[in-house]
Curated annotation (Swiss-Prot):
GO terms of molecular function: DNA-binding transcription activator activity, RNA polymerase II-specific; DNA-binding transcription factor activity; DNA-binding transcription factor activity, RNA polymerase II-specific; enzyme binding; RNA polymerase II cis-regulatory region sequence-specific DNA binding; sequence-specific double-stranded DNA binding
Location(s) in or outside the cell: Nucleus; Cytoplasm
UniProt protein name: Homeobox protein Hox-A9
Subunit-structure text: Transiently interacts with PRMT5 in TNF-alpha stimulated endothelial cells. Interacts with EIF4E.
Amino acid sequence: MATTGALGNYYVDSFLLGADAADELSVGRYAPGTLGQPPRQAATLAEHPDFSPCSFQSKATVFGASWNPVHAAGANAVPAAVYHHHHHHPYVHPQAPVAAAAPDGRYMRSWLEPTPGALSFAGLPSSRPYGIKPEPLSARRGDCPTLDTHTLSLTDYACGSPPVDREKQPSEGAFSENNAENESGGDKPPIDPNNPAANWLHARSTRKKRCPYTKHQTLELEKEFLFNMYLTRDRRYEVARLLNLTERQVKIWFQNRRMKMKKINKDRAKDE
């Protein structure tokens, strides 16, 4: 309201007395400080009260002497243009401490080795699960500690296989030893070849082991074949009982002997 009243008086004086006289009156009547506008000062930056002060050490200026050092001042003494300049800094938000300044002026690499029990920040990848005591990676690959708890560490995977696989290996070895003992100790029951449910991978051969005849048995069978190439059922039973053979064995031997004799006679006819 004071500014509009002063402008109104200025226009009234210029209309009545003229422009030159109005300028002289306005200079004497209205001092520079009465309009409520503070004089423009040098461009000094002040920190915004909502942001925490920067904790990094001051380094050499990059842009020359045009950048003035930052002074702590109240929010009422900063012009609107300076506030507008502050809003163009997108990285002024509070951040996690990345590096801590050492007393000798160097930055310590605190992000490489996080302390045990530290909290992980959301959205930031972590190289080691926090809350676990870091173990040295210089352990030999064969010296793997047993897994007493469910917590996992990097050294568990440096031994060649995950802990779950190492737990399964002893049980599998014991199972294979038991199978070997069972196979060597007792004979398995014979598998029925007519059973379609039997697995052909584990089924044994159904062919019986070849049982060669003794010299005595062969000689007696040859004598009987010379007398009669075909045996009756009663005579086959008697021969099998005398030679300690089954009737089927006697029958098969006579069939094979007849086929052999037929082949010999055929070859002899070709030679003649």
